[in-house]
Amino acid sequence: MTILFLTMVISYFGCMKAAPMKEANVRGQGSLAYTGVRTHGTLESMNGPKAGSRGLTSLADTFEHVIEELLDEDQKVRPNEENNKDADLYTSRVMLSSQVPLEPPLLFLLEEYKNYLDAANMSMRVRRHSDPARRGELSVCDSISEWVTAADKKTAVDMSGGTVTVLEKVPVSKGQLKQYFYETKCNPMGYTKEGCRGIDKRHWNSQCRTTQSYVRALTMDSKKRIGWRFIRIDTSCVCTLTIKRGR
């Protein structure tokens, strides 16, 4: 968990360098710094462990704030939800990098870190009983998640239903970066490939199916026009049920 925390801190300061600063009056009190950021001292030195816990929570909230700013431009170009209900499926699982990312997207790490903070405030007994593995909790469908490149995807479907070519590299000021997509799909080698876990097969037909959501990526259409478009990628594995009729 220490390694995870350090990874998030490094990612956070990288975001700080890239994120645009807004007007001071938006932040309040005439400060251009992000809320919750300390310029000196350590979390442990601020009145003991309780203050450290408050500091960690504040830091986690700061991550969310930075992420909101980084995705601010994407939200401006987000499709009109009244005209396309599929816009609700928009998600951020794209990263531009010179090498394969070693961790899931920052939003996933942030959620995991918050869960860690919640667990840290529990007693050992409560924490032990809240562990899903100890409660016997299992996923209805087995899934796998991994980073893939445009070389793996090659083509995708955009929001208008057309097939576009996913560009492998994105030009930047100092060269080129590869587009990586964090995809989640049903595990073909898992125990649920023949049906969902925990479903009464006497009354239901079940199947684990991979579903998709929209992400924004650099693509080229059939007319050789290059631009940022919303495309579909695999993002989850869900269970679908149909009732069995009379035999």
Swiss-Prot record:
It comes from the Eukaryota. Residues 1-18 form the signal peptide. InterPro entries: Brain-der_neurotrophic_factor, Cystine-knot_cytokine, Nerve_growth_factor-like, Nerve_growth_factor-rel, Nerve_growth_factor_CS. Glycans are attached at residue 121. One of its GO terms (cellular component) is synaptic vesicle. One of its GO terms (biological process) is negative regulation of neuron apoptotic process. The record marks 57-58 as: Cleavage. Its main location: secreted. Residues 19-128 form a propeptide. Keywords: Cleavage on pair of basic residues, Disulfide bond, Glycoprotein, Growth factor, Secreted, Signal. The keyword Glycoprotein applies. Disulfide bonds join 141-208, 186-237, 196-239. SUPFAM superfamilies: Cystine-knot cytokines. GO terms for molecular function: growth factor activity; nerve growth factor receptor binding. It is found in: Secreted. Mature BDNF is produced by proteolytic removal of the propeptide, catalyzed by a FURIN family member. In addition, the precursor form is proteolytically cleaved within the propeptide, but this is not an obligatory intermediate for the production of mature BDNF. Can be converted into mature BDNF by plasmin (PLG). Important signaling molecule that activates signaling cascades downstream of NTRK2. During development, promotes the survival and differentiation of selected neuronal populations of the peripheral and central nervous systems. Participates in axonal growth, pathfinding and in the modulation of dendritic growth and morphology. Major regulator of synaptic transmission and plasticity at adult synapses in many regions of the CNS. Monomers and homodimers. Binds to NTRK2/TRKB. Can form heterodimers with other neurotrophin family members, such as NTF3 and NTF4 (in vitro), but the physiological relevance of this is not clear. BDNF precursor form: interacts with the heterodimer formed by NGFR and SORCS2. Mature BDNF has much lower affinity for the heterodimer formed by NGFR and SORCS2. Belongs to the NGF-beta family. This is Neurotrophic factor BDNF precursor form. It comes from Ailurus fulgens. The lineage of its organism: Eukaryota, Metazoa, Chordata, Craniata, Vertebrata. The gene is BDNF.
